[in-house]
């Protein structure tokens, strides 16, 4: 299947000069969504994984069915204040300010092998923060998977030597 034909391009969103890749059009197509998840699971089949972690919010949409298909647990990396229990937090720099990701204490145990899943690799800031958060818990990132990688933004430079797999590579 040509997954790129299922991704809508929205120019100048969320601000002028940005070409936003909207995955909701792929998600609305049941066949395309299933095949995309199956293909991502296939890309990750050689990773030795205990749990899948995914950042809010679109990471949840891909991470949950992948965890189910792979028979693994799912760990949600949330924005601040969204978790009801005690959380571990990691703050990171955005273009215009700071943000944070949090995970429940004990959701990722020391030594857990973690596959990090998100929808789009653009600047790499969110996923790099996810890597640092997982490391804070004692977990080990064994791979990172994306539906889409936007080329030309050098995001992989922020991810070090972690194995990265992507279903689609599109121009930014």
UniProtKB/Swiss-Prot annotation:
Its EC number is 2.4.2.7. It comes from the Bacteria. CDD domains: PRTases_typeI. Catalyzes a salvage reaction resulting in the formation of AMP, that is energically less costly than de novo synthesis. Its main location: cytoplasm. It comes from Desulforamulus reducens (strain ATCC BAA-1160 / DSM 100696 / MI-1). PANTHER family: ADENINE PHOSPHORIBOSYLTRANSFERASE, PHOSPHORIBOSYLTRANSFERASE DOMAIN-CONTAINING PROTEIN. It is an enzyme of class 2 (transferase). Pathway: Purine metabolism; AMP biosynthesis via salvage pathway; AMP from adenine: step 1/1. Pfam families: Pribosyltran. One of its GO terms (cellular component) is cytoplasm. This is Adenine phosphoribosyltransferase. GO terms for biological process: adenine salvage; AMP salvage; purine ribonucleoside salvage. SUPFAM superfamilies: PRTase-like. Belongs to the purine/pyrimidine phosphoribosyltransferase family. Keywords: Cytoplasm, Glycosyltransferase, Purine salvage, Transferase. HAMAP family: Aden_phosphoribosyltr (MF_00004). It is found in: Cytoplasm. GO terms for molecular function: adenine phosphoribosyltransferase activity. It catalyses: AMP + diphosphate = 5-phospho-alpha-D-ribose 1-diphosphate + adenine.
């Amino acid at each position: 299947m040509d997954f790129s034909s299922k991704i809508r391009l929205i120019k100048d969103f969320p601000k002028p000069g940005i070409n936003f890749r909207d995955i909701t059009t792929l998600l609305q197509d049941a066949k395309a969504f299933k095949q995309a998840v199956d293909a991502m699971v296939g890309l990750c089949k050689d990773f030795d994984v205990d749990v899948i972690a995914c950042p809010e919010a679109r990471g949840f949409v891909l991470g949950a069915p992948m965890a189910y298909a792979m028979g693994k647990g799912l760990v949600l990396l949330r924005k601040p204040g969204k978790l009801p229990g005690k959380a571990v937090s990691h703050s990171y720099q955005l273009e215009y300010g700071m943000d944070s990701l949090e995970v429940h204490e004990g959701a990722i145990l020391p030594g857990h092998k973690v596959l990090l899943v998100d929808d789009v690799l653009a600047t790499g800031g969110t996923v790099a923060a996810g890597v640092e958060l997982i490391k804070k818990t004692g977990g080990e990132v064994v791979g990172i998977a994306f539906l889409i990688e936007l080329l030309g933004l050098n995001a992989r430079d922020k991810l070090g030597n972690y194995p990265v797999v992507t279903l689609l590579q599109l121009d930014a």
